[in-house]
Amino acid sequence: MIAAHCLRCGVALVDRHDGERTRRTCPACGWVFYDNPLPVVAAIVEHEGAVILVRNHGWPEKMFALVTGFLERDETPEAGVLREVREELGLEGEVVSLIGVYDFTMRNELIVAFHVRATGTIVLGAELADHRRVAKEKLRPWPLGTGLAVRDWLARQT
């Protein structure tokens, strides 16, 4: 998200070069919009012997990915990933392990990925159009974003 106006005084921000980067800055009070990456949690969800991939509304018909979501204020990454699994799949989960932390610079996000074991009956949340069950041996990583977490998790399975 790019800020257009100062959060302190409401004046329109301007681009100002600070020697290293160009940043959105308030010409009236000097406030700087740093546009820091947003923390996102991601889950490789194991449920009844398969990995669950999901498809959001608006995504292409064959595009599936991991359960993901933005970390909330005052929430640990572990609590956030379990909340996302509950909200998106209706499942209760337990964090098995941290898989890794991945930059996703094209979306200005920092992904914190976990392996989660889940139980219960899948009930898709409002954000999701579909889900797919994939056997571990058939799961294939994709070259960016959460696909890197899939790659690293699969490497640890053998």
Which residue ranges define each predicted feature?
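Acidic, metal-coordinating catalytic segment for phosphate/diphosphate chemistry
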Residues: 1-42
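Conserved beta-strand segments that form the floor/walls of ligand-binding pockets within enzyme
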Residues: 8, 25, 52-53, 65, ...
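A short coil-to-beta-strand element that immediately follows conserved catalytic motifs
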Residues: 16-17, 92-100
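Conserved Nudix-box catalytic region and its N-terminal flanking loop in Nudix hydrolases
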Residues: 46-87
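Structural detector for helix-capping/boundary residues
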Residues: 69, 83, 96, 134-137
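Active-site-adjacent beta-strand/loop module that shapes the phosphate/pyrophosphate-binding cleft
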Residues: 100-124, 132, 136
